[in-house]
Swiss-Prot record:
Tetramer of two alpha and two beta chains. It comes from Lathyrus sativus (White vetchling). PROSITE patterns: LECTIN_LEGUME_ALPHA (PS00308). Keywords: Lectin, Mannose-binding. It holds the Pfam family Lectin_legB. This is Mannose/glucose-specific lectin alpha chain. Belongs to the leguminous lectin family. One of its GO terms (molecular function) is D-mannose binding. It comes from the Eukaryota. InterPro entries: ConA-like_dom_sf (IPR013320), Lectin_LegA_CS (IPR000985), Legume_lectin_dom (IPR001220).
Amino acid sequence: VTSYTLNEVVPLKDVVPEWVRIGFSATTGAEFAAHEVLSWSFHSELGGTSASKQS
């Protein structure tokens, strides 16, 4: 089994509106594959308040 990890910090405040929806997408071309998101986290700081989501 091959395992890959993606970890990237992206400053979104300059490129997306205040309210957004985040999605995941993956492909293998013509072949079938199953992809799993085993965990994710989100952190936001707006005007001195902060919100976090860990799943």
